Regions:
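Alpha-helical transmembrane segments of multi-pass membrane transport proteins
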Residues: 1-191
Length: 191
């Protein structure tokens, strides 16, 4: 999105959609994404009110984009409503919601001459993409497994934890064996 007017606003929308889809929390998404991108947008010359409005409007999109905890809970409470159908509907609604915000952000950014971001170098893009693939694959595994019926939503959560642990330990090397007791204790306390 680098050279598109309002590029940082579009990044905010996409970041909220992805973060929110994993966390199923608009508050967590808006805090995490907005906490990083709003100051950056202001430093780049965006109006703080515009940056905040984009963040607030886009934070809830992730709640309807699968894997959506709200849809999983609805399916359980409604007596087995099809999670696949709910997820497909969520993709459509969430994507249109995010796209709508991006169109409005584009028009406002163009009108106010908000700066674009310099085009990234080829080597930088490929490096970032290589680093992101294992994390993005988590979403594909969860959603693909549920939609194909390979596993249930509850089983998907266990698979997600195991996969996340494996890539954190062996690919990103950010978690060590010694960290596991503390992580397990925190997980128990949070649940």
């Amino acid at each position: 999105v680098g050279r598109v007017p309002g590029a940082l606003a579009h990044t905010n929308v996409l970041g909220n959609a992805l973060f929110g889809s994993i966390s199923s929390s608009a508050i967590a998404a808006s805090t995490a994404i907005g906490g990083v991108l709003i100051p950056q947008q202001v430093n780049e010359g965006y109006d703080r009110k515009f940056a905040t409005a984009v963040n607030i409007a886009s934070a809830p999109t992730g709640m309807v984009i699968p894997p959506s905890t709200a849809f999983i809970m609805y399916s359980l409470v409604a007596g087995g409503a099809s999670i696949s159908s709910l997820f497909l509907g969520g993709y459509l609604v969430g994507s249109l919601w995010a796209l709508g915000i991006m169109v409005v952000a584009y028009v406002i950014a163009k009108r106010h001459n908000y700066p674009t971001v310099a085009k990234a170098k080829k080597g930088e893009v490929s490096k970032v993409l290589r680093e992101a693939v294992p994390s993005v694959l988590l979403i594909v595994i969860i959603i693909g497994g549920i939609l194909t019926g390979l596993f249930t939503a509850i089983e998907a959560s266990a698979i997600a934890v195991a996969y996340s642990l494996l890539i954190s330990m062996f690919y990103y090397k950010t978690v060590k064996i010694n960290d596991l007791p503390k992580m397990l204790k925190e997980a128990v306390l949070m649940s």
